[in-house]
Amino acid sequence: MNLLIKGGRVVDPSQNIDDTMDLLVEDGRIKEIGKGLKAPAGAEIIDAAGLLVTPGLIDMHVHLRDPGLEYKEDIVTGTRAAAAGGFTSVACMPNTKPVNDNKAITSYIVNKAAKEALVNVFPVGSITQGSKGESLAEMGELKESGCVAVSDDGRPVVNGELMRRALEYAKGMGIMVISHSEELALVGEGVMNEGFTATELGLKGIPWAAEDVAVARDVYLAEFTDSPLHIAHISTSGSVRIIRNAKARGVKVTCETAPHYFSLTDDAVRGYNTNAKMNPPLREAADVAAIKAGLADGTIDAIATDHAPHHLDEKDLEFNLALNGIVGLETSLPLSLQLVEEGVVDLKVLLEKMTCNPAKILGIDRGTLKVGAAADITVIDPDREWLVAAEKLASKSKNSPFIGRKMKGAAVYTVVGGKVVYKID
């Protein structure tokens, strides 16, 4: 299929482009980018006047729950939600059932995605067998079968020696280690951020030190082994400071945060709202400010949703019993665009964190509109206002703290491999 996207504001950080231009797609790849392009016979034409045209957004941290937990989400519904949110590529975490720690599970995901997914799916394998933190998984096998990174996400690798070996082996194999940095002994029975709100609500708190101590350990291990390391979903001012200092020393560390960590504070838990329960927990206003500062100065490399769908029965419980996690694929873009509205970052910097930076961290050939690249494109209306309604979410699960919130900014077209996979109503 041939496609011409005309007259949009093309913003591609990978090429330092920000101009009103046309984009021509032929045979699933970017054929030409420029002004006044002519549509070939039979080409589909998208009028993008007044809209943003960007490289397809990449979410490097999602939970598709497939295989084994399809009652929460599956590859079809998860990628449908991704497309609705403007994402053309997602990296899916290994805490499936069974855990993605071997070639068979990775191959299942790759093959099912090839047949049924609306967007590109890049599997992440587990660091340890069964994500139990006892012995390393076969990283070489995981990479060969299609994994772009390894992580025990959902749990930390508690054993420091094992984490050291993981970093060393992954370095040799050229695959990224993604750390879920959390000191479980400090977490204890905590269910939300430790602070005034937790005390007021009578809930056990999780101190910021539970994250910071683990981030510091993993940063030092990366420095000691001279290995690349990516730290997932940072939420505290301390994590930002530790990573900023590490980068200044030349440590090969990158990190991500999630939209909820710069959009909400632990006040969202008031009323015992289990849709505001996640791990790491929502923090205080000072942490939100630090996360925004980290995004602004480049300490934080990527924005990823940590899309974590759960069935209503797993959330409609008393707060202590409800599972951690929220869906985020369909609300990430407007929440992130708010950073531009507030002057935290400019549009080019924001898009770096949602396109070329995640692609670079994962080592995938996406996140660019260069001629010859795969035609993964997101067309965005930054001014479109809409209401987050549970019944309109494409995800199988509806566990979002943003239900009922008015949003500004939406994907109007999502194009994967030159094919329009989503068009807004």
UniProtKB/Swiss-Prot annotation:
Kindly give the Pfam families that the UniProt entry links to this protein: Amidohydro_1
**Which keywords belong to this entry?**
Hydrolase, Metal-binding, Pyrimidine biosynthesis, Zinc
Q: What is the lineage of its organism?
A: Bacteria, Pseudomonadati, Thermodesulfobacteriota, Desulfuromonadia, Geobacterales
Pathway, according to UniProt? Pyrimidine metabolism; UMP biosynthesis via de novo pathway; (S)-dihydroorotate from bicarbonate: step 3/3
Q: Give each disulfide bond as a residue pair.
A: none
Q: Which cofactor does it need?
A: Zn(2+)
Q: Which GO terms describe its biological process?
A: 'de novo' UMP biosynthetic process; purine nucleobase catabolic process
Q: Which residues bind Zn(2+) 1?
A: H61, H63, D153, D306
- Naturally occurring in which organism (per UniProt): Geotalea uraniireducens (strain Rf4)
This protein is called Dihydroorotase
